[in-house]
Amino acid sequence: MPVGFDTSAASSAPASTPAADAPRVSPRSSQRTAVAARRARASRRHPDPWRDADAQTNVDEMARSLEARGRTPAQARLRRRFLKFVPVGSGARVLEVGCGTGVVVRDLAALVGRRGKVVGIDASRRLLDRARALCRETARRTPIALRVADAASLPFAADRFDAALAITVILHVADPLRVVREMARVTRPGGRVGVQDQDFGVVAVTHPDRALTERIMRGVAERVYVEPHSGRRLPGLLRAAGLVDVRLLTDVYQDTTLEPWTKTFLERRAERAVRFGIVDVSTAERWLDGFTEVVAADAFVLTLNYYGAVGTKSA
């Protein structure tokens, strides 16, 4: 039976909803070693599903998870703050790498307006099909183009965009330096390259069994993401790609009530921990029951750090 929160008992936890869930500057040999390590993680028996979404049997659920996360107020605040930090203004031509279902594309369209243009690329045709449907109304007000493309070999001329962004993408990439260099190539001199990622080495959550929580959270992150600690590496990554005036924005997703997106995030951690052999089913269910107890005591807290780095392409 699927691992999930026990909703039969009275609890203050909300009902389940259909939702989801860089190297530093170093000698060239060290960079090659880092890339090789990320590629090895990417080819493990339990690969990152987002690297090849179209090959997954649950891509529709993945699409719903992106939209559910996008609707979460705390996540929307994180995006708005990062886009303001870049910044993105009226009339800008902006590229989003790894646009998924177009959550950020729609945010960008509202910022650039009729005189601007937003281009979104993704490796997944199926996610882009969903994005086209969801962006149809927005595209009547702002020029939007969506296309299948490889982030490591962008199909655009040099100096084409005012800004190129990748939001919660780099942690899924085996060679992030190559991707950021491509983003810089297609950005005009004086334009901005911005990347934002979670860092799964900095997750705090209240639970009666801290050791078990650490084992599950760390074990799943190391098996699912190519680079689970991507967030802390972003400033060095931009500098290694030749960008200047690199700035760092730190932010935190926080939840004190076990919101639907957080609930599903934890359920997925439990399910994957079982699938990867980190814990058995009964242990995973006991772990989730612990959160129900914490919520009932009005003591639940989950925080996940986000890091955003923005650099300028020199003339």
Go through each PLM region and give its residues.
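Conserved alpha-helix/loop element of class I SAM-dependent methyltransferases that forms part
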Residues: 73-90, 107
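Conserved catalytic/acceptor-binding region of the Class I
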Residues: 192-259
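Conserved Class I S-adenosyl-L-methionine
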Residues: 247-315
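A short glycine-rich, Lys/Arg-flanked "PGG" loop and its adjoining helix->strand segment in the class I
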Residues: 177-192
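N-terminal, positively charged/glycine-rich alpha-helical extensions of SAM-dependent methyltransferases
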Residues: 2-9, 24-64
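Class I SAM-dependent methyltransferase SAM/SAH-binding core
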Residues: 95-97, 101-153
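A short SAM/SAH-binding and catalytic strip from SAM-dependent methyltransferases
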Residues: 162-175
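A short acidic, Gly/Pro-enriched loop at the edge of an enzyme's catalytic core
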Residues: 152-163
